[in-house]
């Protein structure tokens, strides 16, 4: 049996812009992707901390160091620039491995600069 678990999360990301006319997706700074163990085209679940809205989309890699979190297409209707969101990816894992699996958590500041990074259940690593 396989179970669906949190794989990684960018916590407290701030939406920097939106492009309603784009085909869809969320553009994320490539440095943040690397730190959070996320990859381009990966499906994400986003939660808007300002209004409670939840939406799914996929990742587009943004420019390294830009600290960009841009919502594209219909997702741009779900959060406005300045809104704080949580970006999560999930993985299917064999049930016998699930108890030892540890998701990666990246916490960013209000400018999307990485603050801390850790595996769930392990000590924070300030960045």
Swiss-Prot record:
User: Which CDD domains does this UniProt record tie to the protein?
Assistant: Asp_decarbox
Q: Which cofactor does it need?
A: pyruvate
Give the note describing cofactor binding and stoichiometry.
Binds 1 pyruvoyl group covalently per subunit.
Q: What the entry says about post-translational processing?
A: Is synthesized initially as an inactive proenzyme, which is activated by self-cleavage at a specific serine bond to produce a beta-subunit with a hydroxyl group at its C-terminus and an alpha-subunit with a pyruvoyl group at its N-terminus.
**GO MF entries:** aspartate 1-decarboxylase activity
The record's section on Pfam families has: Asp_decarbox
- UniProt entry keywords in alphabetical sequence: Autocatalytic cleavage, Cytoplasm, Decarboxylase, Lyase, Pantothenate biosynthesis, Pyruvate, Schiff base, Zymogen
Q: In which pathway does it act?
A: Cofactor biosynthesis; (R)-pantothenate biosynthesis; beta-alanine from L-aspartate: step 1/1
The record's catalysed reaction(s) read: L-aspartate + H(+) = beta-alanine + CO2
Q: What EC number(s) does the entry state?
A: 4.1.1.11
This protein's GO cellular component annotations are: cytosol
Provide one Gene Ontology biological process annotation. Answer: pantothenate biosynthetic process
Where Pyruvic acid (Ser) occurs, the residues are 25
List locations, semicolon-separated: Cytoplasm
**Subcellular location, principal:** cytoplasm
Where along the chain is substrate bound?
57, 73-75
What this chain does, per the record?
A: Catalyzes the pyruvoyl-dependent decarboxylation of aspartate to produce beta-alanine.
Instruction: Read off the PANTHER family from this record.
Output: ASPARTATE 1-DECARBOXYLASE (PTHR21012:SF0)
Subunit and interaction comment: Heterooctamer of four alpha and four beta subunits.
Which family is this protein grouped under?
Answer: Belongs to the PanD family.
Name of the molecule in the record: Aspartate 1-decarboxylase
Which gene name belongs to this protein? panD
């Amino acid at each position: 049996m396989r179970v669906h678990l949190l794989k990684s999360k960018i916590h407290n990301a701030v939406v920097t812009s939106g492009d309603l006319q784009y085909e869809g997706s969320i553009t994320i700074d490539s440095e943040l992707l690397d730190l959070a163990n996320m990859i381009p085209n990966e499906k994400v679940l986003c939660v808007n901390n300002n209004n409670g809205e939840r939406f799914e989309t996929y990742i587009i890699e943004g420019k390294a160091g830009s600290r960009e979190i841009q919502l594209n297409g219909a997702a741009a209707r779900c959060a406005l620039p300045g809104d704080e969101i949580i970006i999560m990816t999930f993985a299917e894992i064999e049930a016998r491995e699930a108890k030892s699996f540890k998701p990666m958590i990246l916490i960013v500041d209000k400018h999307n600069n990485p603050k801390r990074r850790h595996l769930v259940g392990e000590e924070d690593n300030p960045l």
